[in-house]
Regions:
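Metal-dependent phosphoesterase signature
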Residues: 56-90
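C-terminal cap/substrate-recognition subdomain and adjoining C-terminal extension
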Residues: 1, 74, 81-242
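Conserved active-site and cofactor/substrate-binding residues in soluble primary-metabolism enzymes
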Residues: 16, 67, 155
Length: 242
């Protein structure tokens, strides 16, 4: 059995789906922008290294407070169809289909919340989808619980270990991994065939030195500043996808 493992945000599509989903919800529920009163100070604490990424993610998700499970499921379904699918890189979709045709087990492995990572993975025909395990309750609480770690760095490898052969030979023979992020270096080094997508200078330097493929599909924001501007608008519920 061989594997093809894909990151989600800025890998399959040019956006961070965490703020893109927030934008989608806030445009339909404008009063939920009140979450910013909590998230703003929390972001300052995170910048000062006084709050963990995991805790900040819980505060960020406060915009979901009070939603019932049927309401959240309806939002996720609409988000996948209306925002995610149209934004996917055709070049990366082609890679997904190429790996499927080769008979590889497709794994979507993301730090984004599992409740919509699973929906995206199912819609795209992935065999397995893994995200940060945000606990769903009915209704959603102010600060949703996260079961386990933020699914990033080595946590991604731990989260999919049960899918792998009992005896591992590393790098995993015949396996592929796709990511934009230096945070995914453990994942990229885990496989025989790493592929980077619009890597930052640090990751690009490693990719060039290691002779890893670098994919640069067209994207709507040509600079890091433009990407961060889009993220800010999304966090405010003011972003309109081109």
């Amino acid at each position: 059995m061989s594997f093809a493992i894909f990151d989600l945000d800025q890998t399959l599509l040019p956006y961070d789906t965490q703020v893109l989903f927030c934008n989608f919800v806030l445009k339909q529920h404008p009063l939920r922008r009140a979450y910013l009163a909590l998230f703003g100070p929390a972001a300052v604490l995170k910048a000062a290294h006084l709050l963990s990424t995991r805790a900040l993610k819980r505060v960020f998700l406060s915009y979901l407070r009070g939603l019932s499970q049927p309401e959240l499921e309806k939002l996720v379904s609409a988000f996948v169809e209306q925002e995610v699918l149209p934004a996917l890189y055709p070049e990366l979709l082609a890679e997904v289909e190429r790996q499927r045709a080769a008979g590889r087990t497709l794994i979507l492995n993301s730090a984004s919340p599992s409740f919509y990572v699973g929906a995206i993975g199912s819609r795209l025909g992935f065999h397995h989808s893994i995200g940060t395990a945000v606990r769903l309750t009915d209704p959603m609480p102010l600060f949703p619980e996260i079961d386990g770690p933020n699914n990033k760095y080595e946590a991604k490898l731990i989260a999919m270990r049960h899918l792998m052969p009992t005896e591992l030979s590393l790098p995993l023979p015949g396996a592929w991994a796709y990511s934009d992020s230096k945070a995914d270096l453990p994942l990229l080094r885990f496989v025989e065939n790493p592929v980077t997508i619009h890597p930052d200078p640090f990751l690009a330097n490693i990719a060039e030195h290691e002779h890893w493929p670098i994919l640069t599909p067209p994207r709507p924001h040509p600079t890091r500043f433009a990407f961060l501007k889009d993220c800010t608008l999304q966090a405010l519920g003011l972003f309109r996808r081109p």
